Amino acid sequence: MDKSVRLRDNREYNVVYKRGKTYYNRNFSLVVYNSKKGTRIGFSVTKKYGNAVERNRIKRKLREIVRLNFSEFDKGLDMVIIPKKNTEDLTYKQLESALLHVCRKASNKKCQK
């Protein structure tokens, strides 16, 4: 993933958390905020998920899913993807379909707040 499509500062994450709208499914929470800077995506994996190895593994998988399916994401949105604990048992294909499901759910609502 290119650095221009990542949320990087703590400040940017805070804006998305405070002003964004949250969408859920069984495996992910997705916080979405309308942005004027183009589509940017960040990942947040809590310590409840497991040790650093497990947290980094899920982030690597999610980054790859986003990279390969970037055209599926709505333009002009800042998004924070938060995987839930039960995602550690899913295969790559199941992760991909679950993430795209919650993204479609968010884009159907037009992510307005």
UniProtKB/Swiss-Prot annotation:
Tell me which InterPro entries the record gives: Ribosomal_Su5_D2-typ_SF, Ribsml_uS5_D2-typ_fold_subgr, RNase_P, RNase_P_CS
Query: What does it catalyze?
Result: Endonucleolytic cleavage of RNA, removing 5'-extranucleotides from tRNA precursor
Q: Name one GO biological process term.
A: tRNA 5'-leader removal
On whether Zinc is a keyword of this UniProt record, the answer is: no
- Its Enzyme Commission number(s) read 3.1.26.5
The UniProt entry, under Pfam families, shows: Ribonuclease_P (PF00825)
Protein family? Belongs to the RnpA family.
Under the heading PANTHER family, the entry gives: RIBONUCLEASE P PROTEIN COMPONENT
Stored HAMAP family: RNase_P
**Role noted for this protein:** RNaseP catalyzes the removal of the 5'-leader sequence from pre-tRNA to produce the mature 5'-terminus. It can also cleave other RNA substrates such as 4.5S RNA. The protein component plays an auxiliary but essential role in vivo by binding to the 5'-leader sequence and broadening the substrate specificity of the ribozyme.
Q: How does it assemble?
A: Consists of a catalytic RNA component (M1 or rnpB) and a protein subunit.
Protein name per its UniProtKB record: Ribonuclease P protein component
The species this protein belongs to is Finegoldia magna (strain ATCC 29328 / DSM 20472 / WAL 2508) (Peptostreptococcus magnus)
Q: Which gene encodes it?
A: rnpA
